[in-house]
Amino acid sequence: MRTAYCGQLNLSHVGLEVTLCGWVNKYRNFGKLIFVDLRDREGCIQVYFNSDAQKKTYVRAADLKQEFCIQLTGIVRSRPVSQINKNMSTGFIEIEAKFFLVLNVSNPLPLDIHQDNIEENRLKYRYLDLRRPIMFHNIQTRSRVMALTHRFMELEGLLNIDTPVLAKSTPEGARDYLVPSRLHINKYYALPQSPQMFKQLLMIAGIDRYYQITKCFRDEDLRSDRQPEFTQIDVEISFITAKKIRELMEFFICKLWKEILNVELEVFSQFSYAEVISRFGSDSPDLRNPIEMKDVSSIFQSLGNKLFICNAGCVDTIDTQVIVMNVPSGFKLTRNEIDKYSDYAKKSGIQQFLWMKIQMNDCKEITAIDGPIINLLNKNFLQLLMAQVKIENNDILFFGFNNDKNLSTTRMLSALRSKLGYDLNLVKQDSWKPLWIVDFPMFKKNTSGKLVSMHHMFTAPKDNDLICLKRNPELAVSEAYDIVINGCEVGSGSVRIHSYKLQQAMFDILGITRENQQKKFGCLMNALKYGAPPHAGIALGLDRLVMLLTKSNNIRDVIAFPKTTGAMDLMIDAPD
């Protein structure tokens, strides 16, 4: 029906007759000339109808309206110099219309595809929202990422194998979506939260190197980077170390950024879990933000077992964790702004919040200090503080106090760190800061004090140390690893347990009875008895990767037909 796409025409096509198909993007009637911007998935091109040259075509064109779907034949012409539009990729040319056919008319649109619209309307009329160029760009980028993934994985010798969607319910952290069986009354399939067991079984089967781009389903509370159904790039490889699989995935992500954005990513930083929590208060830190935290409890405890009085009130110096955040160029903050940040920190659980502004000369000598903490400023205190905290001229120091040993003070301050970074324009928006996080604890305690897996229950402890795992599970460190880019966790993986005894011990620690071990995981447990190889894997969030690559605000903008934060599909009115 067409010989070219609108957005692909250029000056080299001048004089050629072309047939185009698309939608009326804009319509302008100037009397003897009618101008239409014709749009297809590749872009827009200006078409003009001349009443003198093509009378019948011109008369019919007067009835065109926005979003009519048409087929048009015409001649590619170069625009007069005065009419060149450098804001369009086709702005140097236009089409002189000879004939057109209306393929379908359009009612007035319920939303304006030339501007932003409220989220509810965008999701209800998603098929119209996808006509917006930015949305097409996002979906096209997603397609490119998937194609690049397939090419990369095949070149690396991984086999693309799909695993079942109708599976068995297993305790993996989130709630399952259940599908009742018609043939087996009162029995249910579960939609997989991940293909975890299946890909491990593939390794035991000798497949050796596996991948797939797969749908996963989790019935959990949603946010901007979560959907009830999401897509992940799933990888599992036998006879590989954690270091080698990290190198492979780092190479893959660098290729994505190079191919899609023409950006050379720097070598990924690597931090332990304990380090990112202590320095940034988060296990998915945005390293573009230069603000770091430091535990200075010992400095305050050196003041003695007493309360000190300042403008902010009384603060206990003993048995209290004190975390300082050094905010570059924060001297300019007003007292009113500081008070707002103080309130923000206290809403996160911080019991007391103090500040200190510092000015220095070129010799790094302090010349001015301000803040409610000023009555503490003896020479010894300042020397101890400057020995632990890197302070520059015009910085402001924020001190957060917390005496609840069950709560992490740095985690409480993490949201404030992020807010300050954006409020003060400290985050370099055009930069990329990828990192690996390693050495996660094997377990954490849930709200009832029970041990649960930090990652999942198939993650191996470091060095496969069964004795350490049994003796003191709370101190066990896992062979898990996460990828974080600009504060967004885009991947998570681990070396897997390949020993029957070690997997059994893991289940025992988690309080899963031997009976339930067989009931829930009997297939995997039995398979581990038959020469299971060492293996490791990772899952990358495709939606999150594309969100970053397109600089979108949430993953709904990179999924063709997403759900709301309430897990509703407004377009098809599901669930019903």
Curated annotation (Swiss-Prot):
Transmembrane segments: none annotated. ATP binds at residues 218-220, 227, 489, 541-544. Keywords: Aminoacyl-tRNA synthetase, ATP-binding, Cytoplasm, Ligase, Nucleotide-binding, Protein biosynthesis. GO terms for molecular function: aspartate-tRNA ligase activity; ATP binding; nucleic acid binding. GO terms for cellular component: cytoplasm. It catalyses: tRNA(Asp) + L-aspartate + ATP = L-aspartyl-tRNA(Asp) + AMP + diphosphate. Residues 196-199 are annotated as: Aspartate. Its EC number is 6.1.1.12. One of its GO terms (biological process) is aspartyl-tRNA aminoacylation. It is found in: Cytoplasm. Pfam families: GAD, tRNA-synt_2, tRNA_anti-codon. L-aspartate binds at residues 172, 218, 455, 496. Homodimer. Belongs to the class-II aminoacyl-tRNA synthetase family. Type 1 subfamily. Catalyzes the attachment of L-aspartate to tRNA(Asp) in a two-step reaction: L-aspartate is first activated by ATP to form Asp-AMP and then transferred to the acceptor end of tRNA(Asp). This is Aspartate--tRNA ligase. The gene is aspS.
